[in-house]
Amino acid sequence: MPRIPNGITTDGFSFYRWWQKGKQYVWDKIIRQIFLGDSDIDPNRFFFFGISEGAYGSQRLASFYADYLAGVGPIAGGEPLVNAPSENSANIAFCLGTGSLDDSYGRNALTAAAKADFERLQAAHPGYYDHKIDVVEGAYHGTANLLYYDTIPWLINKTRKTNPKYVYWERLEQDGIYRRGFYNLYIPETEKPTERRCYEMTITGNTVDIKVNKVSYTATAWEDKHGMPIAYDKTYTSVSGGKLGIFLGNELVDLTKEVTVNINGKQAWKGIPELKIENLVNSCALYYDPYRLYPAYVEVDL
């Protein structure tokens, strides 16, 4: 798309952001057409790229739609991480480049913050959080020869990781919309949440371990030019209440054997999952993804 959305302003609010509700409806339709349509597009080589405003959008959308993506390439951007949690990008390739002299809206400082965050996460989770994030020395916002030419060569051979056995989902809101599914996880309740929850799933053999916490943010550092927060402390607290659905296929566990689901270290379900056509139908209707047609489904109380 060669331009930002129309910048109509109503009641002091501008509608030219790529992550806003009206654009999400379009993204959802595009994703469905790509993943279930007759196009020649490989659903495992689907990327978001963007420059400037498009960089903000692609970084946000990467965190929101990571389960559909092979990778993302924001250029000359930098989004506050409260809007685009790095944790959600565990299974995609993430490439971000911003000039060291690009200080408007804290772009250089926010890019440096993202680099530090991805390095922290990659060290804690080897094999995940594949990234190339650079604050390019001497580059301004529009220094094309220094910023633009590394992104596609680095991403070109990346492919989507389907059915990963480690998933982190910080279920954030984008313009009033919450996704109800992410990778193989599903939120049965339809009402909007009153808190931001994090779901961290690790599958080992036939054991599914899931940590569920509430997260809150406290800004700890600000950039000088505009006073925008660039660093946060995250506080996690245990939660109770609600339900969580887990779709399962043979890509994730051995469905002929007993499966154990633990929530925050306590056994929440154990048994041999029933294989039902309705689970295939429901997972297709939820994800619109040929690689996520799951015959088994388990729902647990939190």
Regions found by a protein language model. Name each.
Residues M1-T10:
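Conserved alpha/beta-hydrolase
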Residues N6, S52-E53:
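Short, solvent-exposed turn/loop segments enriched in Gly/Ser/Thr/Pro and often Arg
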Residues D11-W19, S104-T111, W222-E223, D233-T235:
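Short, flexible/disordered intra-domain loops and linkers
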Residues F13-S52, S63-Y68:
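Gly/Ser-rich "nucleophile elbow"/oxyanion-hole loop immediately N-terminal to the catalytic nucleophile
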Residues E53-G54, A76:
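N-terminal low-complexity, intrinsically disordered tails enriched in Ser/Pro/Gly
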Residues G71-I156:
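The feature captures the conserved acid-bearing segment of alpha/beta-hydrolase catalytic domains
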Residues R120-L302:
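Alpha/beta-hydrolase-fold serine-hydrolase catalytic core, especially in secreted/extracellular enzymes
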